[in-house]
Each structure stands twice: as C-alpha cells, then as structure tokens.
Amino acid sequence: MSQSKSNILWFLPTHGDGRYLGTATGGREVNFNYLRQIAQAADQLGYFGVLLPTGRSCEDSWIVASSVAPFTERLRYLVAVRPGLQSPSVAARMTATLDRITNGRLLINVVTGGDPVENKGDGIFLGHDERYEVTREFLNVYSDLLGGKAVNVEGKHIRIEDGKLLFPPVQSPRPPLYFGGSSDAGIDVAVDTVDKYLTWGEPPAQVAEKIARVREVANARGRKLSFGIRLHVIVRETNEEAWSAANELIKHVSDDTIARAQRNFARMDSVGQQRMAQLHGGKRDKLEISPNLWAGVGLVRGGAGTALVGDAQTVAARIKEYQDIGIDTFIMSGYPHLEEAYRFAELVFPLLSLDHGSNVTRLHHNSGPFGETVGNDYRPSRLASQS
C-alpha cells in the first residue's frame, strides 16, 4: 500500500521569534530581512508554502507576503481574509492582485476571529454565531467575484450593487480557501464555502472525531473537503534531545506569565481556543497529552499550542498517524523559525512522501489588459466587443 502524499507548509513569525517562550531572553528582532530569510529558506528547502498570522499581535500579512514573495520562486503564501473587517469586493481585488503578481502562489486563510476584545478594537461588536453569518455572506460574494460573476446581493450583513472584478486571479476559479472553525456555526459555514478544513493540533483521536463530524455534514450537502492541521515541531537526532529542547523552550516561563496568558485566552469565544486550553489546563505537570504530542506551547501562546516532539522517525510516524485519519496538509513551525525550518526539512522530509511537485511557474501569468481601463469600468477589449 503506497504512502499518501502530503503538503508541508512552514510559518512566517510576524508576531515575534526567539529561542524561548514567554520571555525577552533569547528574543530575536523580526524585521523584513529576517522574514525574507525564512521565506527563502522555506522556498529552497522545498516547503509547499508558508502561513502568515493575522491580528493585532502581528504585522499585516498582505503587506508582508507581497514584500517577500518576489524573493522566492515556488513558495506559496497562506494569507488571511477577514470577514467583517474587509469588504468582500475589496478583499477579492486584493486576492486577485496578489495571486497575479505571485503567478498563482496565493492561498487564502479565512479567519472569522475569536477574541471579542480584539474584535471590538477593530470595530466588530457581533456575537460568535453572527460573525459566522457574516463569514458566509462574505465568502459567497467573494467567491462569485473571483469566479468572474457580477454580484448584486442584499443580505442580512452585506449589501453589494453591481459588484465586479476587472482583473481576474491566475488560479481558476480562485485561490484555494482554507478555514478553521470548531464550533457548529463554523463547521456549518466551512462545508458550504471552502476547500480545506483546518484544525489545531489536537490528539489524533479528537482530530478523527472532528473530521468525521465535518465529513458527515459535508456529505449530506454533496460537498467534499480536504483537511489540514496546524502544529509546532521539536525534532532532534534523538528523542532525549528533543524532549530536552521542549523543556528548554519554556524554562523562562513563570507561573505568573502562564496565568496572565490563560486569563486572556479565557475571554475568547473561539471553540478551537477553548479546546486547546483544555488540553493542558494551564498547568505544566502533564504536558504530553498524547504520545509525542506536547502542549507546552499553549501555556503562553494563543492559537496553535501543541508540538510534535521526538527524533525524525518518531515525528514522521506521528505525522503518518494524522495522514491515516485524513489529514493531507501540515502547517508546521518551530522556535526559532529559521533554524527549525532547516532542521525539520533535513531530518523529516526524507521520511515523508510529499506532494510538492507542481510547478506554479507553468501557470499563465495574466499581466492585465492591453491599454488603460476605460471610464474606470471597462477593459478596452470588452468595450470594443460591444461596438
């Protein structure tokens, strides 16, 4: 039986990086040159792409992606659209432009947002389920525009008149949509609107239950989704070295720092974040929550809070466990991100079957219409065809 192939993405740490968590000790200046280094390393090492985080704790993902992309050749960029923060028509134009200037190397991460405090700071005062209503309306308009349709819609949250996109994306009908949402409302939106359902790194049994739940809803609606997972990784040449590195990563984290971080996470209405917090309960004593799955990162970091820990063979075996339950995309990271990008690729890639062979440079680079747009509304070729 042949081993299933996977896509492996890395991570651009636009919110900060360093050798240790929860401290300025060993911290690293994260500037443009450093992010470019990581992106170029990921490109040269053969990663499928990189995820860029979103939110007020990090640099703007669209600006960073458009800045570093010209320094890479094959690397894809998983960048967030934010329903409720962006108009779907403006987001569609941004998407098409970045897809065009990267020659089809854009992936889209749909982020509804699970922190009410941050949401209010950005002008969003809707409750949990209402935000997913906005996400559904947003994605319907957004996908129609990218697919070349004219849009007129009056929804509960979004109203568009004569919406259209003059410059289409390179990828047809649009770049792939990735989406994570563990609540019933999130899953309900995902199965109707996106291509890949994402989960944070829960134990395999819990991930299998979640996948089965999503598939059941999707099958009932005649839809089929693929699945991805977001994990950290601590891989070394021996298991002992890997576990030592895991303990080193949190050696400067104080109990006060953990308590403060957990209070912040507790205010969130994200079901996924709640599930992450339940894995460790804010305590250090039982952080290996499943064989070689360590929850230490989640003591102080929001979002993805678990890491695969072990030697290369062990980490590869755990990845294959997730593959066996339906995961085909792994979004990985490690501290510091430059060194760990090399370490993970050099030690683990040879043990995996990777589906990274597609050559995006073969896509047709649509450089736009010949001649200037007429009246801010028509491409010259279209105007001529109507005469």
UniProtKB/Swiss-Prot annotation:
SUPFAM superfamilies to which the protein is assigned, alphabetical: Bacterial luciferase-like (SSF51679)
Enzyme class: oxidoreductase
EC number: 1.14.14.5
Region (Disordered): 365-387
GO molecular function per UniProt: alkanesulfonate monooxygenase activity
Family: Belongs to the SsuD family.
Name the UniProt record assigns to this protein: Alkanesulfonate monooxygenase
Species annotation: Bradyrhizobium diazoefficiens (strain JCM 10833 / BCRC 13528 / IAM 13628 / NBRC 14792 / USDA 110)
